[in-house]
Amino acid sequence: MAAPLLHTRLPGDAAASSSAVKTLGASRTGISNMRALENDFFSSPPRKTVRFGGTVTEVLLKYKKGETNDFELLKNQLLDPDIKDDQIISWLLEFRSSVMYLTKDFEQLISIILRLPWLKSQTVVEEYLAFLANLVSAQTVFLRPCLGMIASHFVPPRVIIKEGDVDVSDSDDEDDNLPANFDTCHRALQIIARYVPSTPWFLMPILVEKFPFVRKSERTLECYVHNLLRISVYFPTLRHEILELIIEKLLKLDVNASRQDIEDAEETATQTCGGTDSTEGLFNMDEDEETEHETKAGPERLDQMVHPVAECLDILMSLVLSYMKDVCYVDGQVDNGKTKDLYRDLINIFDKLLLSTHASCHVQFFMFYLCSFKLGFAEAFLEHLWKKLQDPSNPAIIRQAAGNYIGSFLARAKFIPLITVRSCLDLLVNWLHIYLNNQDSGTKAFCDVALHGPFYSACQAVFYTFVFRHKQLLSGNLKEGLRYLQSLNFEWIVMSQLNPLKICLPSVVNFFAAITNKYQLVFCYTIIERNNRQMLPVIRSTAGGDSVQTCTNPLDTFFPFDPCVLKRSKKFIDPIYQVWEDMSAEELQEFKKPMRKEIVEDEDDDFLKGEVPQNDTVIGITPSSFDAHFRSPSSSVGSPPVLYMQPSPL
């Protein structure tokens, strides 16, 4: 029986759909009626058999004998751009009765038939589907061309206007029948699969090959991805490969649209065009017409991204997130079995593509969103990352990335309860203590990222999580909360010879120092000052001569769940996302007190003064400055040459 098709979001619709996986609607022939109709076509005799002095069969047999005149006439008739529906139907009926003669010798003829404009009247569609079924069942050599033809219809047709040899217009055809045409193509795939069970195996390479170039229009990419996701529903064996293909393409977009570039584009557009697309108005001479257009499309335009790559990425990301919800939710409730299956697919893709990708900003949010469906999946994700981090057989870059993900996930996932946060902190801190114990008598017990990268990454995950969650950890019974934090023994970590305060991102270190200082958990400022004095400048050659720089990110820090700035995707993420909580006026005053010029060597005195050292590496501790300085650095010193590090041309 044909599987149901997916309706996540109709390409071109303004609003993102939250519909579940639905069966074929009344707009299409029902499954049982479809089969009955197919059987009628398969058994019906040709209505017209005479062409050019004989049947198609006779023409084909003559061609094999070397008589090509009738064959050439046949091809010319099929290539007629003004061919009528009745003519198409008549030819298809004859070809069905001659399908046994359509061997590989007639590959050119089949290619012409596959280019016929068959997505027209319902009668033409039904006859064409019957022909495809007969052809692939009798001549499997033509299975790939048939599948390729169908896949080529998963994007809007192009409208090309020429003046001489020059294309003056090349755009998507806004055909109202496009959704129905997509439905028909999916139906065609299912019919073919019924006669050739190996269809999915042959289909996947074709879907990869037909994936539009990422510089194609957003609508073209949206339609193709939409149709790939629908295929994954009725060909579930292809789901993993389809999702991997989509996410791989999203990554190529993501690494070419940094968060900073996106925000800069939005800010520039707001300043210059009052928040509208900066390209609009350049060719609109009629102000009244422009105003009317804006009024009609106002809600849609509010979701548009100014940055063109971000706009495409946002559309596709929201489509994937909507698909995930459609798959996992049944009647408004999470289906554990379906969600578990999807989690297995996505965690494998995450390991293969995301964990080794340094420059992605948004694609990884598919894991964030999936984990929000049920706590068990969030805990499974954390356990998976933990195993990656503490496994010495993994490359250091993978272990460090796992640490980055743990810290960012614990800090930003609003759906993770405090008990899970505490359990993860216990696990991380205990591992750090064991690591330090093992270094005490070793020859490598000194500060070096190359030697202890995973250790520093775990330290930063702890510091980062603590900064975000300290209010929750101390809420309720303050004395009990302090007792718990004291049991973590931050002092041993901070005072160790490995000196994590020197390696971790300065913004993280300074917030950690300020908060632990306030609650007398550990006193960091003397170490910070000593580290600052020991920080050696690095001389780098530039186009304008040598320049002196200080490496402020030796750990190559990356916070994968920094705030999402894609407008459509944010609607999925914001309800489950932990933003930085504003500090009270009293806290601000305490944290912002300037330190005296003299370096305070006594940490007890430093704590009593409640001061934060003011130097080049310390940021202002205000709610407005937090997210800006606490994000992944826009560029990192010593970044490893991992996948997608260098933006590739789209």
Swiss-Prot record:
Keywords: Nucleus, Phosphoprotein, Transcription, Transcription regulation. Part of Pol I pre-initiation complex (PIC), in which Pol I core assembles with RRN3 and promoter-bound UTBF and SL1/TIF-IB complex. Interacts with POLR1F, EIF3L, TAF1B and TAF1C. Residues 499-650 are annotated as: Interaction with POLR1F. Residues 630-650 are annotated as: Disordered. GO terms for molecular function: RNA polymerase I core binding; RNA polymerase I general transcription initiation factor activity. GO terms for biological process: transcription initiation at RNA polymerase I promoter. One of its GO terms (cellular component) is nucleolus. The keyword Nucleus applies. This is RNA polymerase I-specific transcription initiation factor RRN3. The modification Phosphothreonine is found at T199. The keyword Transcription applies. Required for efficient transcription initiation by RNA polymerase I (Pol I). Required for the formation of the competent pre-initiation complex (PIC). Phosphorylated at Thr-199 by MAPK9/JNK2, which abrogates initiation complex formation. It is found in: Nucleus, Nucleolus. The modification Phosphoserine is found at S169, S171, S639. Residues 632-642 have a biased composition (Low complexity). Residues 556-650 are annotated as: Interaction with EIF3L. Transmembrane segments: none annotated.
